[in-house]
Amino acid sequence: MEQKRTGLSYVFTLAKEERGKLSLGMLLAVFSSALSFVPYLVVYQILLLIIKQEVTLPAMLGWAGIGIAAAVLQAILTSFAGICSHTAAFNTMHRIKVRVLEHMSKFNLGFFQEHAPGQIKTTLFDDVDRIETFLAHSTLELAQAIVVPLMMFIFMLRLNWIMALIMLVPMILGIAIPMALMGRYPDLTDEFAGDTEKLNASANEFITAMPVIKMYHLTAEKFEQYRNSLKIYTDCWIKMCESSCNPLSIALVVLDSAILFTLPVGGWLYLRDSLSAASYLLFILLTMCFFTSFLNMVTIAMQSMELGSGLDNVKKIMDMETMKSGQQTLSKTGCYGIDFDNVTFNYTQGGKDALSDVDIHLEPGSLNAFVGPSGAGKTTAVQLLGRYWDVSSGTIKIGGVPVTELQTENLSDLTAFVFQDVFLLEDTLLENIRMGTDATEEQVRQAAKAAQIDDFIMSLPKGYATRIGDEGVKLSGGQQQRISIARAILKDAPIVIFDEATSYSDIENEHKIQLALQNLLKGKTTIMIAHRLHTIRNADNIVVFQDGKVVEQGTHDELIASGSTYSHMWDTYTRETIGEE
């Protein structure tokens, strides 16, 4: 079944706090447009004076003064209307972006792995900016397009009802024909929004991956992918233009030729003495003014169709279910065990299980290792511990409390992750380690020393005040990893998870990090994920994953003695290590 498009009413729902300013702006715009009608009345009155041969200087100056005053007042009202609508639009844009970000901050972290940054960026900026543009400009034009033609039509009815009804003919044709010919335009706006997201994602990937692309001579292949995305985007844009060009052209022709309806009918009425010469000329002037205002309604209809896909994207995010926070809390100074009780998880409903019937018990303060081939489920297991996603069935507990029953802030305080891919802010090294905490510079330095990165930082001219990023220092993969470890040490959470924590470290630094971790992680429940099996020989418990299941667990010596999966992994690893040496 076709999904129902989000209506314009949702725009005003999003802008409900600004309805007062928007209403005032629209009201001022209506008065301003009504004043644009005054010059035509002035011309009409002057024509009457000329026809009646009652022209006097005071009368002419009086009507001229009225016309000038109306023009000045119209300019003032238009200015204030724009101030009201733009203020409301910018406030609404700010409020929507804050609300969307706040809402997204309550999602499971898996949402950000499932959605490309380009897709999120399109919704947060492009779609919301279109809403701002609509509120700032189209709301005023909409009020003018409805009220001004209506006022003119009522005036023309009082002047001559036959001429007024004749004016409806081009108006009806100008609406009906374009709407009938619009065809796939509404669907194309949805398609265009999707193509825009894909183009942003493709461009982001192409630029971000440029070093790897050049290293492996993939420039032509990856550029071809980007060019294909650009071609799809361009083709859709051309289809939209083709779909709207003919209807809009017909609307313009019909509405601009409205005078062809009023001229002959007005002439016929004049010859029959049913219409005065002054009224006849006034109708000719009003015809041009009437349909210029009315044409805005056709333009706004097109804009609303384009706005619809953006509204759909915003509403889709705002309607997404957030991660439910529990009510219980655990002290950050405690020491807790971790239990996976019959945990099963799949990324898509009905899809293959990424984890199946996983049972693990990790003792408080123990050093644990999750090992296994890529895709075995070890990273998924620790992500479920941090509630990147919630389990499909079973329970994960910290200190006997299910993670779903813990307050989300408390769960974050209890766990510290060292990710394989390190994200660094374009800020100083001090702030990158501090990460929003109130730690002193000395505490940051102690954490950096423990992570074996203090010597490098102090060797820089600005030390901890050195900035990272385009305008600052560039860090190697191993240095970035140690910054991440320093963050985890500074956080001092009772549970620490290292995902491929030493994958970027050379032998010397890896040894230093291992020594530091042995001293600093005492009393903490630690999970390490590593392919370098020699780094976890001293682990209290090694959990072996294969195809989403736990196939064995125990100490290094116990697993070697069993001669099973881990033993074969160890033999393969040692042979490869000796071969490399």
Describe each region flagged by the PLM.
Residues 12, 16-20, 109-110, 126-135, ...:
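An intracellular "coupling" helix at the cytosolic face of ABC transporter transmembrane type-1 domains
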Residues 22-77, 159-162, 274-277:
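Transmembrane helix-loop-helix hairpins at lipid-water interfaces of multipass membrane proteins
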Residues 2, 83-102, 140-147, 167-211, ...:
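Cytoplasmic coupling helices
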Residues 49-65, 155-169, 243-312, 317-318:
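Helix-loop-helix
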Residues 333-581:
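ABC-type nucleotide-binding domain
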Residues 1-3, 90, 98-122, 126-128, ...:
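Short intracellular "coupling" helices and adjacent cytoplasmic loop segments at the cytosolic face
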Residues 1-36, 51-63, 81-85, 89, ...:
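Membrane-integrated ABC transporters
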Residues 27, 31, 35-39, 125-170, ...:
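Hydrophobic alpha-helical transmembrane segments of ABC transporter permease domains
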